[in-house]
Amino acid sequence: MIICNFMNICMIDPNDVYKWFMEFSLDSYDWVMINNVYSMGLFADGGLTTTKPYITSSNYVLKMSNIKKDGYWNVVWDTLYYNFIYHNYDKFKGRGKIYLSQWDRQRKKQEILKLAPKIMNRL
């Protein structure tokens, strides 16, 4: 889910994500990957099977792993996270209200919107 989460906040095309997962794993099957990638991982089915997208800030990664905060990867991750919320703001109305409030409270909006395209172009 973390890899799919990162691909989602990078706004990688869902079909490319699906293809990557199918080629990455020896035991990947359509009946598993279609739901895992398009529904749970990317919310690309428009909410048919999930109520909101599974996206997280770097805080979740820090809590669920032994990765340390270093001021680089977590800034990149959080920039992409908030950029994703900004670009999908209207889609979150009625579904992902927590994401809306996080964006609304964000103090570095202009900095994020300026930095995100630079990060995405380097990926």
From Swiss-Prot:
- Organism, by scientific name, is Acanthamoeba polyphaga mimivirus (APMV)
According to the record, the segments passing through the membrane are: none
User: What protein name is recorded for this chain?
Assistant: Uncharacterized protein R855
Q: Which domain of life is it from?
A: Viruses
Q: What Gene3D superfamilies is this protein classified in?
A: Deoxyribodipyrimidine photolyase-related, DNA Cyclobutane Dipyrimidine Photolyase, subunit A, domain 3
